[in-house]
Amino acid sequence: MVVLCALRTARTGISRQIFSTQPAQFLHCSGARLIVADKDLLIKLRKKTGYSFTNCKKALEKFHSDLQQAEAWLHEQAHKEGWSKASKLQGRKTKEGLIGLLHDGNLAVLVEVNCETDFVARNIKFQQLVQQAAVATMEHCHSKQANTIDYTKSFLMAEEIKQLKTSLDNRALADQLALAIGNLGENMAIRRAAWVAVPSDWYIGTYVHGQLPADNPSLSKMMFGKYGALVVYRALEQNSKINLPELGRRLGQHIVGMMPLSVGSMDDPPGDDSETKMLAQPFLLDSGTTVGQFLQMSGVSVLDFVRYECGEAAEVGETV
């Protein structure tokens, strides 16, 4: 409780002092009589940007109640403050965070974004950053898939993801990351992303464990949690009794829980709980049956999967 209160106090102090490191002209006005900001405009600007009333008032006064210019200036100052804060916090460990999952038809994306504390991971501004990373990766996937109908799987590491542009304001994700760091006062990292695209007669199963509720309607298409899985599969035969989307969710649940390293072969002998080939593993939801046997009874074939665990050890060649 003491730690939680300290974190809340720290975040409150940061929000009150936003832009405090900016040049004097940002928070200091000339001795001439200031133009009184229209109350409705002030409330509107505050609601739209989330910045303090003090800074919204200064922006409106600076631009003579021009809402558009005031908003643009506030964002510019916030990005400068964010980069300054990011530079100061660089090197602090980011072991917490979220896995974000976005699924749209025959495309699906997993991203991992890290922060210092679980408290910040539950903040909507952090979740919006995860969403921006997922959407930017999805748009990148769309551009790569424009002229192909084949199955594709691809991975993006930190530096590649940060260069992607967001649809929000066409800024690079690196800028959005710096802005979030400035707003929330913790070091953060956009670590990695994976995406899969499948032909029209294939399926993508999705599952997130430790899922957080979407507290904002704008996040309704996202899934957030500490573990996430994508599984690619197809039906070998028509069976109206099989709920294929639900089957995909169960396979994703198995992948998260049993941590397979490869799909394996239907010819692999049944293994125990230490087995790493998915088809030979005991099925998580029915330990008396292997995954391979379950799929055979369902008339389904698994082709590939991706599993992410937030904060897991970096793979060879990966930088965090």
Q: What does each model-identified segment do?
A:
Residues 2-11, 15-320:
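N-terminal assembly/interaction segments in proteins that build large macromolecular machines
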